[in-house]
């Protein structure tokens, strides 16, 4: 099965576009993803990106809840209110919009981070710091990385 793995940092061009790494584009092609669902991550200052199946997975979780429950309402607020659909251009570039910049702090470079079934857009230094923190916490807990 194709997965989004590894990370890569690319520069944003003068028109505000960034090239999605070829390995990530290959996964999108293998999965026949035409439209990207992007949402503001719940934990990290990152934008999570996947196909419509990613949105559908969250909507199934919401549908399993009482529609008037606080959990269902919070999840909908995050998934629907904090999400947008986007498309890559013909050259495999993504427009780095205010939606992305405002939430992540991205300015001139984007770090693409594989998360198995989706990928994330990070401000490069924030990714390095979060990864170091995660390693440190696992080390303190005596867990193998």
Curated annotation (Swiss-Prot):
Query: Keywords on this record?
Result: Cytoplasm, DNA-binding, Repeat, Transcription, Transcription regulation
One GO MF term = transcription cis-regulatory region binding
Compartments annotated for it: namely: Cytoplasm, Nucleoid
Q: Which cysteines are joined by disulfide bonds?
A: none
Which species does this protein come from?
A: Rhizobium leguminosarum bv. trifolii (strain WSM2304)
Is Glycosyltransferase among this UniProt entry's keywords?
no
Keyword rRNA-binding carried by entry? no
Q: Which Gene3D superfamilies match?
A: Transcriptional regulator MraZ domain
Q: Which residues form the SpoVT-AbrB domain?
A: 7-54, 83-126
A Pfam family this protein belongs to? MraZ
Name one cellular component (GO) term.
cytoplasm
Mind telling me which InterPro entries this protein's record contains? MraZ, MraZ_C, MraZ_dom, MraZ_N, MraZ_sf, SpoVT-AbrB_dom, SpoVT-AbrB_sf
Q: What is this protein called?
A: Transcriptional regulator MraZ
């Amino acid at each position: 099965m194709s997965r989004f793995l590894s990370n890569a940092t690319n520069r944003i061009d003068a028109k505000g576009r960034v090239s999605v790494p070829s390995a990530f584009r290959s996964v999108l092609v293998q999965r026949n993803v035409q439209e990207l669902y992007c949402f503001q991550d719940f934990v990290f200052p990152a934008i999570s990106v996947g196909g419509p199946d990613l949105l559908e997975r969250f909507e199934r979780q919401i549908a399993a809840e009482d529609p008037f429950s606080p959990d269902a309402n919070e999840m909908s607020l995050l998934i629907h209110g904090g999400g947008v659909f986007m498309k890559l251009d013909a050259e495999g570039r993504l427009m780095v919009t205010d939606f992305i910049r405002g939430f992540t702090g991205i300015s001139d470079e984007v770090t693409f981070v594989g998360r198995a079934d989706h990928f994330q857009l990070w401000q490069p230094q924030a990714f390095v710091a979060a990864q170091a923190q995660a390693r440190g916490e696992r080390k303190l807990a005596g867990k193998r990385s």
